[in-house]
Amino acid sequence: MWEKGKFYRSILKKTYFFFKVIFIYISLINISFANLEKNLINKLTATKTLSFDFKQKIDEKEEIGNCFLKYPLLIKCNYKNLKQKSIISNGKTVAIIKKKYKKIYYYPIKITPFFLILNKEKVINLIRKNKPIEVNSNLIRFEFIDKKKNKVKIFFDKNSLEFKGWETKDSYSNDVSFTINNLKNNTQIVDNF
């Protein structure tokens, strides 16, 4: 009988130790995420402009170019392709310009993913209200789903906390991946939007 009680006490001690370790681990993760969230929000708050090179992939088609972004809601991207394509947002409208074909397509910014991506306050609220959907050794990913069930995934470099790009679907339901390279924060942008 004594051996049986000793065995149960041993099991209880091990179980208690196990739950204590799990509790400490979860607490450390929450503290770590809180610091990460605070640092990411501070980085975004301090950012006024961004300039960067990009690689955009729509299904299997890749395009490259460079962009200038000025918060809130202003962006100008020049694609390095034969169509001489540009995307410009003036804060109200997004214009896709194809100089080679002399065509311009206009969209209200509110119906595009740019309304979230180019609005720093919306991104900060997304970070405050949501946990990342993924954190790996390189990236932190957040997901935003609007009222119409459109998804935008925004990602940041885990170490530098710099904006690294986004993923969404275009108006034809094609997967769009936009990756940022050679990012420069708070540089003087001389171009008018």
Regions found by a protein language model. Give the residues of each.
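N-terminal secretory signal peptides that target proteins for export/translocation
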Residues: 1-14
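Flexible, surface-exposed loop/linker segments and immediately adjacent secondary-structure boundaries
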Residues: 100-139
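N-terminal signal peptide c-region/cleavage motif recognized by signal peptidases
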Residues: 29-31
